[in-house]
Regions:
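Non-catalytic DNA-recognition/assembly elements of restriction-modification systems
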Residues: 1-42, 139-183
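DNA target-recognition domains and sequence-specific DNA-contacting regions of bacterial/archaeal
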Residues: 5-133
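A short, hydrophobic, proline-anchored segment that marks a local hinge/packing element in signaling
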Residues: 135-137
């Protein structure tokens, strides 16, 4: 059992003075940096801002801190910035380096610990959630078992891919049956 504040730190970002309603939802030559808000569609990245004055983040975890989606948690593997009603946290150990699979596991663990616990009047701000605990697998000597995390996420990915292939094969078989019966 680990407190979030013992594993992560909130990232300070420059304040950007844009209204989401004035920002494009499609990237162009100037407005090309995805901007994080409290939404859950597209991992909260629904608008674009210029790079100028923005704090560019990548390979961090974002957390929605407002509205109906407060506590929604995503691993952000691509460049983005924080616009409003959300924030980003970074891992403070192992030289701040984790693999994508490790980030996915930690994001799921954080989501399980906080999503649905907070609400409009009790927002999931960092000062509140940093005391929440997450459960992580440990090695025999009490360290976080990153090898197990890698293995588990790889196994889950393989199962998902297998199920998608099986589903697709069934759909193809149904389609072929309809075609064969009608032509």
């Amino acid at each position: 059992k680990y407190k979030l504040g013992d594993l992560f730190t909130k990232i300070k970002t420059n304040s950007l003075h844009y209204k989401t309603s004035d920002l494009p939802s499609v990237s162009d030559n100037i407005y090309c940096l995805p901007a994080l808000t409290a939404g859950i569609q597209n991992q909260g990245l629904n608008n674009f801002v210029p790079y100028e004055n923005a704090t560019v983040l990548q390979n961090v975890i974002s957390i929605s801190a407002n509205g109906a989606n407060t506590g929604a948690t995503f691993y952000q593997s691509q460049k983005f910035t924080v616009l409003q009603d959300a924030y980003a946290i970074k891992w403070i150990y192992t030289n701040n380096k984790l693999t994508d699979k490790q980030y996915l596991f930690l994001t799921g663990s954080i989501s399980k610990a906080i999503y649905g616990t907070y609400e409009w009047t009790n927002k999931a701000g960092w000062e509140r959630i940093k005391n929440n605990a997450i459960f992580l697998p440990q090695t025999e000597n009490g360290k976080i078992d990153f090898e197990y995390i890698e293995l588990l996420i790889s196994a889950i990915q393989k199962i998902v891919i297998k199920n998608v292939v099986l589903y697709t094969d069934k759909q193809i078989a149904k389609t072929q049956k309809v075609i064969n019966n009608n032509f």
